[in-house]
Amino acid sequence: MHATVARQWIERWDRQQEVSLPEREDRFIALIDAVQEATGMADPLVLDVGCGPGSLGIRLLERLPGATVIGIDADPVTLALGRAAHGDRITFTSIDLRDPGWPSRLPVDRPADAAVSTTALHWLTEDALRAFYRTLADVLRPGGVFLNGDHLHENPGTAPVLARLGRALNELEDQRRFPVGHGESWTGWWDSVTADPALAPLAAERAALNVGADHSSSEAILLSVHVDALRAAGFAEVGTLWQRGANRLLCAIRLAPPTRPRAASPLSGRAIPGGGAR
């Protein structure tokens, strides 16, 4: 596929994403700010989890051109678009996050400094999400950061009033923002992909792989599930850095190993000729 054609499809992808996520760019900016501040590096190794066609990764590279971005996804359509448009800057790797052995397929030789994801992990079941977070902790360096931008809701089982109010506010805001005919939808974009002769074979492959079949798992859209799973996986601090309603940027810091007390020097407390004890 020619890069120009791929970029046109990605532009349409970005527009249809912005229809339901008006603050998408603001969340991207906040996430990249956090990567920059948390790593303190000009050349971090960053895993873009559920990367799609590379919308987040290419924005991160605009801010941090020295970064190495590894995009991982199982979708053959968006991977093909990303490789054609941004393959010279992002390393796109076909990985199914439901596969417990996914870290072995990463084209890296050291732990990552950061892992990022936007609007992707909500399709995993709770069991798959917990397993993914456990393996993610193993591929991040101690002190590394994980950032997840997504709609994560309050748990109706433990906070029923907050959950109901949050969803009501989201629905009311959607009604104000999205009148009839507001733009191309997620379904409309994929219908166009399927109808395109150049992309139809990849769309058929996507369907055969069952990619996105569990989209919007009821468990993985709950904030409490992500927080609990991250802490259980060994992330020391978990909290929200940026938020607009249920649309939030969740941050987790990989637990660093405990610092061992320094062994006492054999000279400690010994009298030094010509001086006192040191």
Residue ranges and their predicted role:
Residues 1-42, 55-59, 147-176, 181-185:
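Conserved class I S-adenosyl-L-methionine
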Residues 50-54:
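Class I SAM-dependent methyltransferase "Motif I" SAM/SAH-binding loop
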Residues 55-102:
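Class I SAM-dependent methyltransferase SAM/SAH-binding core
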Residues 116:
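A conserved beta-strand element that flanks and buttresses the S-adenosyl-L-methionine
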Residues 130-142:
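A short glycine-rich, Lys/Arg-flanked "PGG" loop and its adjoining helix->strand segment in the class I
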Residues 217-233:
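Short alpha-helix
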Residues 233-278:
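Core SAM-dependent methyltransferase catalytic element
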